């Protein structure tokens, strides 16, 4: 029986007690510190950076340049020119219309004497002009025509 046991052990199928285990030295891997790459931050709309609408009632043409600054900063602008002289109102509307056009925006009449100026970052839907009697001739609609 010793013969068969020896053969089984020699083939590797038997248990012969514990064999001496040779320990291999453990090698430590070199580690290099990894610095995380900076990701691109994208701002999400919040209440702080929400769009602001400026409402103004200019008294003279000298205020038109200050109002155009709002358009340059991509803020929509509502201007009420009721109650000021016709020529002064016409100059203000013409100046702000040019500023809005230069910025890729639009001009919409809200009521006679009140206009909405927008820039390219504002999308308007609807057709306000169709709802206002007098069409685009706001001076005649206000009773202040030439």
From Swiss-Prot:
GO terms for biological process: division septum assembly; FtsZ-dependent cytokinesis. GO terms for cellular component: cytoplasm. Transmembrane segments: none annotated. InterPro entries: Cell_div_SepF (IPR023052), Cell_div_SepF/SepF-rel (IPR007561), SepF-like_sf (IPR038594). Keywords: Cell cycle, Cell division, Cytoplasm, Septation. It comes from the Bacteria. It is found in: Cytoplasm. Its main location: cytoplasm. Belongs to the SepF family. Cell division protein that is part of the divisome complex and is recruited early to the Z-ring. Probably stimulates Z-ring formation, perhaps through the cross-linking of FtsZ protofilaments. Its function overlaps with FtsA. HAMAP family: SepF. Homodimer. Interacts with FtsZ. This is Cell division protein SepF. It comes from Moorella thermoacetica (strain ATCC 39073 / JCM 9320).
